Regions:
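Conserved PLP-enzyme active-site core in the AAT-like
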Residues: 64, 94-259, 321, 334, ...
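Short helix-loop-beta connector
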Residues: 82-83, 507-509, 538-540
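Conserved phosphate/anionic-ligand binding catalytic regions in large, soluble enzymes, centered on
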Residues: 221-234, 238-239, 283-287, 372, ...
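General small-molecule cofactor/ligand-binding pocket signal
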Residues: 85, 143-147, 329, 362, ...
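Non-catalytic terminal extensions of PLP-dependent enzymes
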Residues: 2-23, 35-51, 57-60, 69, ...
């Protein structure tokens, strides 16, 4: 499209927003209206210090968000009654699939030998959850059996079960006896739980659940037409080596001070690749952070008040509806009522009155209505609901009494255990204190608000403020994903336009926005390929060719999709070895399903043989999957369709400027050629079809889409091309600066790099004993986040400057690395100790530099202020180098009173 100015776009997006109608939604089914506390919205959600940071792999410059995510894990562990929680997954439905996959991978030897492959799912889980389970289980050879948990008989082939609490209709069920039966048969049980209900209800961990998962959306996160929001996942300690997703753990730094870090990373795809327990990479860190702050702000008593008010309102509403002649079918419930209409009441008439009152209700078959109350429901809302139901019954009603505080479910379901008694959940209950706590944590982190983040293959570009502003509009925030079509015309137009733009950019014919991350996009693309092959009688094809340089998510996604991976060598110039590629494609031509190729490659170069590789795959009966992680070097210059690919995924949080959020949210849409369009993901609720459903919501994290839409509309065709050229130019500028010092590991046929470059650090280690990790830690003393460490080549640093950085910032980065180079030279030449030097001891926290005692051979000034400009702008790390081995040997994944 033609580019818009910021002012023109502001007017345009206002017009689109006005086409969305914000009704009061009682649909429920996993999404509920909430109150996002203003200090959290203002100081986290709308604060670039929080939304522009990267996943906290570099712990020393991530202590703030690591602490915030540890708070989240503590909330989840204590509310679920289980000792171990991760720091978020993509959504509730994919968390269900992750639980099933974990159970399958954790089968006993006897179960593996007996080929136990049946998963039981109760019939009263959310429809979207069941759809995603089916999508994810079938390729792994797992049989999904749906039935009534009360009557299901466990047999030796059943390895796991999934139930909902309260169930999809809102009923609180007693699963204790079911779990006893499951355990007796060797099956493990996962419970999909409503997090807010666990404030009042007995935690599933206390009655034997092996996993408890769900959505934390109710903790202050808007509905956003389906997302983003953070899923949670808690389990027993015995699964700590197989739990999916990232875990924050408490460790210590070089001086014994408490420090936080990502724990047990050897489970994850970037290390284990095809043997990983999950393909998940980007999750929902920003939303988990917000949910954690919500719990910090309200504390245990505040949460009890909120949950109690929701439940009391539901109970009061039940009594008043029964006076009007309606019947409530749920004997025990938390917030959701299932109402049977009397014969003389028309469901259509009731819906018509509801819509006139701007109210959305859930409609079941057989004349039943669902009402899910939430945090925002007040006496006026209850009065409107009773007016609707009275009108449909031909009666008058006026609310005359206040809602009494009362419990309406059987006392046996009531929670008796305390939760959130740690200091952090007691200290910050005023806006002033919370604001200062959030600010203190933010100061401990490096984000794009501080300096360039040059992580290779991560594309840490600017998230323009003008693209972020629409997210705070209620017309985008407060829409339920199952709202009627005529209430979401603005979203519909935006989604259709954005899909068309992405198709044009990629050269493809179809697009889905449903995947919630790049890894989810990979899985979706492979699932679409599998469905297509099955449709043409080629379902036996199960081999995926992968270059040795592939992102770890590629092999992990392929295995999750039921494929077998075959690795192709790379030559000494960093290219995929064409002859090895050809030989392995030919050797597997009868079973070749696909090849996954990143372009430019993860080695930072444009593969000159890319088209020939596409032709080879097609000649052998396979499909070409292009990993879009590096699309920032393609947009406007070429595209996957032109090159010859059949499908690609995009990372909106990389190429298209939506924020990384410290580890999510992400969006990983896929675009496909015409022959694959019929196999794109559907949705059971909105479209009545569960083909290849990969996310809980029909459009995934729809709330993020206005960012990318704004980015494309304001840049226009020429602007997008200029972005790509500038990104490549910046990378080559840095390559020219570093080629005579560190050296560049790979360059392309023209002697240039793509949009990223790999710095050679292996020879540095040979000469001085200084390794790439030491360089990464020393960069922190200058206020910089490290480049990508030891990927895709061990012993190197991969740098991607993006188009967003000015020449002045690039030159500052060069100056810093040249300073570090000179420090390395001092070690090589014997001018500095090989053991006690600024690199081996980096980073240097303020408490160390300002201590009375200084034990190092070099001066404090060299440690903290090696360059003059640091006196004007100094970022202080909060901890010294973190002890990773200690943290993994002593996993502490929640706040506790233990001594370190």
């Amino acid at each position: 499209p033609e580019p818009m100015t910021e002012r023109e776009f502001a007017e345009h997006i206002s017009e689109l927003a006005s086409k969305n109608e914000v009704f009061t939604s009682y649909i429920g089914m996993g999404w509920y209206d909430t109150v996002c506390p203003a200090p959290i919205q203002r100081n986290v959600f709308e604060n670039p210090v929080w939304y522009t940071s990267y996943t906290p792999y570099q712990a020393e410059v991530s202590q703030g968000r690591l602490e915030a995510l540890l708070n989240f894990q503590t909330v989840i562990a204590e509310l679920t009654g289980l000792p171990l929680a991760n720091c978020s997954l993509l959504d509730e439905a994919t968390a269900a699939a992750e639980a099933a996959t974990m159970f399958y991978g954790s089968r006993s030897r006897a179960q593996v030998k007996a080929e136990a492959n049946t998963l039981f799912v109760d019939e009263n889980v959310f429809a979207s959850t069941l759809a995603v389970i089916n999508t994810r289980m079938i390729p792994q050879g797992i049989k999904v059996v749906v039935g009534d948990y009360k009557t299901f008989e466990f047999t030796p082939d059943v390895f796991g079960a999934i139930v909902q609490y309260p169930n999809a209709d809102g009923s609180i069920e007693d699963y204790k006896e079911f779990i006893v039966r499951a355990n007796a048969g060797g099956a493990r049980v996962a419970v999909a739980a409503d997090l807010m209900s666990l404030v009042l209800l007995t935690p599933p961990g206390e009655w034997g659940a092996d996993v408890v998962f769900g959505s934390s959306q109710r903790f202050g996160i808007p509905m956003f037409y389906g997302g983003p929001s953070a899923a949670f996942f808690a389990t027993k300690d015995e699964y700590k080596r197989s739990i999916p997703g990232r875990i924050i753990g408490i460790s210590k730094d070089a001086y014994g001070h408490t420090a936080y870090r990502l724990a047990l990373q050897t489970r994850e795809q970037h290390i284990k690749r095809e043997k990983a327990t999950s393909n998940i990479c980007t999750a929902q860190a920003l939303l988990a952070t917000m949910a954690g702050f919500y719990a910090v702000y309200h504390g245990a008593e505040g949460l009890k008040n909120i949950a109690g008010r929701i439940h009391a309102s539901a109970g009061f509403l039940t009594g008043e509806l029964e006076k009007l002649g309606y019947k409530q079918l749920n004997k025990n419930y938390f917030d959701t009522l299932k109402i049977q209409l009397p014969e003389h009441v028309s469901i259509n008439a009731l819906r018509e009155i509801a819509l006139e009152c701007k109210v959305n209700l859930r409609c079941f078959d057989a004349g039943q209505i669902g009402i899910s109350l939430d945090e925002t429901t007040g006496p006026t809302d209850i009065g409107v609901l009773l007016y609707i139901f009275a009108g449909a019954a031909g009666k008058d009603y006026m609310l005359k009494e206040a809602v009494p505080e009362k419990t309406y479910f059987d006392p046996k379901f009531a929670r008796t255990s305390e939760f959130l008694q740690e200091d952090v959940f007691k200290k910050y209950h005023t806006e002033t204190e919370l604001m200062r706590y959030i600010t203190r944590l933010g100061r401990k982190d490096v984000s794009l608000a501080q300096s360039m983040i040059s992580l290779g293959s991560c594309t840490m570009k600017l998230n323009p403020a003008s693209t972020m502003l629409p997210l705070s509009r209620p017309e985008f925030m407060n829409i339920h994903p199952y709202a009627p079509e005529d209430q979401v015309e603005g979203y519909t137009e935006l989604i259709e336009n954005l899909s068309a733009y992405l198709c044009e950019i990629t050269g493809f014919k179809g697009c889905t926005l449903q995947p919630n991350s790049g890894a989810a996009g990979e899985y979706t693309g492979l699932r679409v390929i599998r469905a297509y092959l099955e449709s043409i009688g080629q379902g036996h094809r199960n081999i995926v060719l992968l270059p040795a340089s592939a992102h770890g998510t590629n092999p992990a996604s392929a295995v999750q999709c039921g494929f077998t991976t075959v690795t192709v060598k790379c030559d000494d110039k960093g290219n995929i070895d064409l002859e090895d590629f050809r030989a392995k494609a030919e050797a597997n031509k009868d079973n070749l399903a696909a090849s996954m190729i990143t372009y430019p490659s993860t080695h930072g170069i444009f593969e000159v043989d890319i088209k020939e590789m596409c032709d080879i795959v097609h000649a052998c009966g396979g499909q070409l999957y292009m990993d879009g992680a590096n699309m920032n070097a393609q947009v406007g210059l070429t595209n996957p369709g032109t090159i010859g690919a059949d499908v690609c995924h995009l990372n909106l949080h990389k190429t298209f400027s939506s924020p990384h959020g410290g580890g999510g949210p992400g969006v990983g849409p896929i675009c496909v050629a015409a022959h694959l369009v019929p196999f794109l993901p559907q949705h059971p609720v909105l479209w009545g079809n569960d083909l290849n459903t990969v996310s809980a919501a029909p459009y995934g994290s729809a709330g993020i889409l206005p960012i990318t839409y704004a980015y494309i509309r304001m840049l226009g065709t020429e602007g997008l091309e200029t972005v790509t050229k500038t990104a490549i130019l910046n990378a080559n500028y840095l390559a020219a600066k570093f080629k005579d010092t560190y050296g560049i590991v790979y360059t392309g046929a023209t002697g240039r790099v793509g949009h990223e470059l790999i710095l050679e650090c292996r020879t540095v280690k040979e000469r001085s004993g200084i390794d790439e990790g030491d360089i990464a830690k020393r960069l922190m003393d200058f206020g910089y986040h490290a480049p990508t460490l030891s990927f895709p080549v061990h012993g190197t640093l991969m740098v991607e400057p993006t188009e967003s950085e000015s020449k002045a910032e690039l030159d500052r980065f060069v100056e810093v690395l040249e300073c570090i180079w000179n420090e390395i030279k001092e070690v090589e030449e014997g001018k500095a100790s090989k053991e006690d030097n600024v690199l081996k001891n980096a980073p240097h926290p303020e408490y160390e530099v300002t201590a009375d005692e200084w034990k190092h051979e070099y001066p404090r000034s060299k440690a903290a202020f090696p360059l003059e400009w640091l006196h004007d702008s100094k970022f202080w790390v909060n901890v010294a180098r973190v002890d990773n081995a200690y943290g993994d040997r002593n996993l502490i994944p929640t706040l506790c009173a233990c001594e370190i």
